[in-house]
Amino acid sequence: MPLSLRSFGWPLVGAAIVAVAGIFVQEPVTDALTGEAVADAGLAFSLGYLLFAPIGAVYDQLSLVTDRQHIFILVSLVVLYACARVWLGLSGRLPSAGLWRRILRESGLGAAAFAGLLAFYAYGVLGPRPMTALRADDPNLVIVDFHSHTEMSHDGRPGLSALDRRAWHDAAGFDLAYVTDHATVETDHAILEAAEAALADNPERAGERLSLLPGREVRFEGQHVLVLGTSDPTAGILESEPWPVVIQTIPNNLTRVPVGGPDGRGGVQGIELVDADPRAFRQSTEERDWILALADSLDLVMIAGSNHHGWGRAAAAWNLVRVPGWREMAPEGVGRQIEALLLRDRAEANRVVERPRLAAALPGEGPARRAWMAVTALPRFGWHILTSLTLPERLAWLGWILLWAAWPLALSPALSPRPR
């Protein structure tokens, strides 16, 4: 087939869209409280990630949408496929066949397309792939995750060991991660043993590599809360014991946040501003003002939690805690300093930074606005991906488009060797 401008039409359109989206680029990492750009930390990408940047960007952003946005995107893709098949049929571009043959053909193709979509989603949840990491420019900043799980939690991915926990957090750029498995009577002893084994595998100095620290997720006053610094679910019950750092998690009923007494016992000292559960993404958006009001009125430190149970390969947010000289300290000592800072300085002790997420409808918006946000979820999601790309990612996308454009050249008879 001779080459023509039409052969390069779609690659040119794709390259133009990717390039134009760069004019409207979003900050790759922002302060979750103020929305301002982060000057002392940024995203880092491995060569493996950049080689497959288009797939990585789609999977990353799919990991950052709410539960309802997942539904809107999936339904939009199904409707788009159905409309495309109807248009092809009406325009005479499909092979002619009898009614029952057409029904069987379209049913089979539709089932295959839907299975392919589910397989794409499933790989994003279960499959291995390079991760986007955060790197801090200030050597005194510790990048922390306060909320994560292993297979010891009833809803943790089977086989998710402490070794896997280290690998995931290390790939995401964390320095320290609290393992906060759910406390149950059946698993208490096993969790304590696993925590001891994880601590034993920590480096001597925290700056050498990622360290795991103990914690628990327990039910307290009808709420799911995190207890930091100990794997003992009874910590702080006795008056003779110090009250540990307790963090209110989301999603939860935030009208029932446990409030401590004058001595600080019996309540929480912090609350999650960002949690990577899709339901929590929705709550943190819809109830953001309430979370901020709680943090202000109760003097709570706001934190981020990956809440990672073994599904997916993207971190939504990171905590930046300033601990001078932490790299030369023992990991447990760094943990104690962080916990002391959270108790003493509260809001000043921690800074949450996050990746940009697709805008969601807010509770005060009218039905028309909410319907518009649902109907346009798919195109807005595509544009959001393109505007959230960093320069290295955008160049990688353009490289793939260049390969796409070069493909017709490779197949062109004009470039094939001619017989003599």
Predicted segments, located by residue:
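N-terminal carbohydrate-binding/catalytic regions of secreted carbohydrate-active enzymes
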Residues: 153-155, 160-192
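Active-site neighborhood of phospho(di)ester-bond hydrolases with catalytic His/Asp-centered motifs
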Residues: 143-150, 174-185, 211-217, 246-251, ...
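Charged catalytic cores and adjacent phosphate/nucleic-acid-binding surfaces used
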Residues: 1-146, 163, 167, 221-231, ...
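Active-site mouth loops of central-metabolism enzymes
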Residues: 148-160, 247-253, 359, 363
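Anion (oxyanion) recognition and catalysis
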Residues: 170, 206, 240-242, 292-296
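Active-site/substrate-binding loop(s) of hydrolase catalytic cores
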Residues: 214-216, 222-236, 245-252
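Short acidic, glycine/proline-enriched helix-loop-strand junctions
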Residues: 186-212, 291, 300
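Metal-dependent catalytic neighborhoods of phosphoester/phosphodiester hydrolases
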Residues: 156, 184-200, 225, 259, ...
